[in-house]
Amino acid sequence: MTKKEMLYEGKGKKLFKTDDENLLISEFKDDLTAFNAEKRGNESGKGALNCRISTEIFHLLEKNGIKTHLVETISDTEQVVKKCKIVPIEVIVRNVATGSLTKRLGIKDGTVLPFALVEFCLKDDALGDPFINDEHCLILNLVQNEAQISEIKNMARKINSILTPFFDNKNLRLIDFKIELGLTKDNELVLADEISPDSCRFWDKFSNEKLDKDRFRQDLGNVKMAYEEVLKRILN
């Protein structure tokens, strides 16, 4: 497969065209961003760690019936993925209150939620990715219909139901995570983007030590070591 010109560059990845119009190459970057890219950094080797972690998790999800855009991983930092039309919604699943949820609703940090909370944000950097509800999704034509909203929520909850016990078995608490979904040329809804410490909050099951991008957000240090620890536990 031939890697051609760059199609898109985001905060954490670059997408390249290939000689197959239905496939792209996704290249994971070492860049770190937080607070809508107002804070920026770089951690050598982070892209390779996220690529490996996301590959392992996507394979786990595929085995459990979740369709994804991943075709194969071809290098330490590159995946071949199906070309998708990304649904312009960031889907957030929360098991424990922390971050923006505590600030918006006054819930005490660390509160275990009675059930997984699914939230939507509009994918729009200029607007600061505002939180939106089901009706906003319909009014803004972000989804095809109400049935697709239900499909998105059901997929998000199923992903959570697979990953939460998996990570618990690795002595990691899956606090929350965000996902992106896409539509293939056959209009099939698939999990796209990545699942990694860039897009999830992982706390150690016993100490609640943060092992994710919050180490960068909150200047806790040892970002790469935390990502390496997550990968080590996934593989063990």
From Swiss-Prot:
Listed pathway(s): Purine metabolism; IMP biosynthesis via de novo pathway; 5-amino-1-(5-phospho-D-ribosyl)imidazole-4-carboxamide from 5-amino-1-(5-phospho-D-ribosyl)imidazole-4-carboxylate: step 1/2
Keywords noted in UniProt: ATP-binding, Ligase, Nucleotide-binding, Purine biosynthesis
Alphabetized CDD domains for the sequence: SAICAR_synt_PurC
Catalytic activity: 5-amino-1-(5-phospho-D-ribosyl)imidazole-4-carboxylate + L-aspartate + ATP = (2S)-2-[5-amino-1-(5-phospho-beta-D-ribosyl)imidazole-4-carboxamido]succinate + ADP + phosphate + 2 H(+)
Entries under InterPro entries matching the protein: SAICAR_synt/ADE2_N (IPR028923), SAICAR_synt_PurC (IPR033934), SAICAR_synth (IPR001636), SAICAR_synthetase (IPR050089), SAICAR_synthetase_CS (IPR018236)
GO terms assigned for molecular function: ATP binding; phosphoribosylaminoimidazolesuccinocarboxamide synthase activity
The keyword NADP appears for this protein: no
Keyword Repeat appears in the UniProt entry: no
Family: Belongs to the SAICAR synthetase family.
Protein name per the record: Phosphoribosylaminoimidazole-succinocarboxamide synthase
Origin species: Campylobacter jejuni (strain RM1221)
Gene name tied to this protein: purC
